[in-house]
Amino acid sequence: MALGPVVVCLGEALIDRLGPPGGDPAVDRPVDDRLGGAPANVACGLARLGTSVAFAGRLGQDAIGAAFSRLFVERGVDTALLQRDAERPSRIVLVRRARDGERQFQGFDGDQGTGFADQALEPAALPPARWLLIGTLPL
């Protein structure tokens, strides 16, 4: 009998805001917003493969947080360790695209002077799991 998920994915769930080819995602339109963040992507991928997986992270009480909450539930990701933050927004990463399609991460958008929700992750006891994946932003 399993005591917890096989894998816990700890870290970021964010929006990748891709600007138009050759443009700046901070000012040029249209932009293409995609749900992203390596731990969130891995959690969804493992769940689709039938692996018991939990996501541990913190999102804002905003449209981005709501979209991830729905996605995790739809994909079968355990959200018991998902925290929501009423004061800080979810993170948006600005991604510049060259005309040839190459991507360059340019910075963040959405901070209102309080930082981002993922910076305020409250310590929690992780359930027993066989594997732990940690994203790069918490480091």
Predicted regions located by residue number:
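Conserved N-terminal subdomain of the carbohydrate kinase-like
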Residues: 52-136
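Glycine-rich phosphate/adenosyl-contacting loop at the front of the ribokinase-like
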Residues: 1-77, 119
